[in-house]
Swiss-Prot record:
Encoding gene, per UniProt annotation: xylK
Name of the protein described by the UniProt record: 4-hydroxy-2-oxovalerate aldolase 1
UniProt similarity note: Belongs to the 4-hydroxy-2-oxovalerate aldolase family.
Sequence positions that bind Mn(2+): D18, H200, H202
CDD domains per record: DRE_TIM_HOA (cd07943)
Keyword Metal-binding: yes
All residue ranges annotated as the Pyruvate carboxyltransferase domain in the record: 9-261
InterPro entries found in the cross-reference section: 2-IPM_HCS-like, 4OH_2_O-val_aldolase, Aldolase_TIM, DmpG_comm, DRE_TIM_HOA, PYR_CT
Length: 349
């Protein structure tokens, strides 16, 4: 394909959805409005708003939110004039009824998210979103867990259901730049030319920005990023960093870099109760290929049972656990505890 450096990139901010993981879904109404105002001023194209695990994610399994999805969406709708409001829906957590409520509250874009090999479960939700007239996106999570060719087949399914944009989603922050290149080439080879593509990167191997740049070079249309990288694990591609890099490359991103830089440092970073960065634990996510939102759950389990968070995360990766299996984190911790006890008894013999 021919790369067009002058194409207008679609900047999709995820601070108010993926970023929710970094504050345990405790954004206040004032928080979301302050962040949304800054993003709107900077002229991002869309602002995703929801619990970190999407519509209806607020639960015992994923963590209760400080407010409902609808309250957050309505709050953002009150203060934005340029950006469109997006939301995330995981079939099995949210339903078409919840999507209609989000639409009524002001959401006009929905990203229907499934595991990278389970696009089949998105048919009803994608079709209904199109009926509502929403900008409908297929969101293939944990894309490192299948081959580029298989990912392309799943992308084609979502396209056939009505999605007009398909995302390669690196939920574990485990993809290398070559991995991204191969997946975009395979996906774009199978999709219709009119179907857009997007990249959702995580920064667990410090490749969030690099992988987003590679995706754009391969013809990607939409780029997810968040202020100060606010997101699960080591965070997403930091929005202000990606925009600075895009500016240096002469790409047309349409946003105001300095407004984004100010918002990242003055509004978002002070909200973090745990630094969003690459450290021992978040690096383990990318190394082991683990769903980034498992981090905080694994840290709680490690503290409760006197274990290493890294050991729990690596074992989750070995077992190929995926999003939605948060309840298994405690099971893994108990198994490790049992193994440690067995080893101690064996050593004492």
């Amino acid at each position: 394909m021919t790369f067009d450096p002058h194409k207008k990139l679609y900047i999709s901010d995820v601070t108010l959805r993926d970023g929710s993981h970094a504050v345990r879904h405790q954004y206040s109404i004032r928080n979301v409005q302050d962040i949304a105002r800054a993003l709107d001023k900077a002229k991002v194209d869309s602002i995703e708003v929801a619990h970190g695990d999407g519509l209806q994610g607020s639960s015992f399994n994923y963590g209760f939110g400080a407010h409902s999805d609808i309250e957050w969406i309505e709050a953002v709708a009150e203060v934005v004039t340029h950006a469109r409001i997006a939301t995330l829906l995981l079939p099995g957590i949210g339903t078409v009824h919840h999507l209609k409520e989000a639409y009524d509250a002001g959401a006009r874009i929905v990203r229907v998210a499934t595991h990278c090999t389970e696009a089949d479960v998105s048919r009803q939700h994608i079709a209904y979103a199109r009926e509502l007239g929403m900008d409908t996106v297929g969101f293939l999570m944990m894309s490192h867990m299948t081959t580029p060719q298989n990912l392309a087949v799943e992308a084609k399914k979502m396209e056939s259901y009505g999605a007009t944009c398909i995302y390669v989603v690196d939920s574990g922050g485990a993809l290398s730049m070559q991995d991204v290149r191969e997946r975009f080439r395979a996906v774009k080879d199978l999709l219709e030319p009119s179907t857009q593509t997007g990249i959702h990167a995580h920064h667990n191997l410090s490749l969030g920005v690099a992988n987003s740049i590679v995706a754009v070079e391969e013809g990607c249309d939409r780029i997810d990023a968040s202020l100060a990288g606010m997101g699960a694990g080591a965070g997403n591609a930091p929005l202000e960093v990606f925009v600075a890099a895009a500016e240096r490359l002469g790409w047309n991103h349409g946003t105001d870099l300095y407004t984004l830089m100010d918002a990242a440092d003055e509004i978002v970073r002070p909200l973090q109760d745990r630094p969003v960065r690459v450290d021992r634990e978040t690096l383990a996510l990318g190394y082991a290929g683990v769903y980034s939102s498992f981090l905080r759950h694994a840290e709680v389990a490690a503290s409760k049972y006197g274990l290493s968070t890294v050991d729990i995360l690596v074992e989750l990766g070995r077992r190929r656990m995926v999003g939605g299996q948060e309840d298994m984190i405690v099971d893994v911790a108990l198994d490790l505890l049992r193994q440690r006890g067995d080893a101690a008894r064996q050593a004492a013999v």
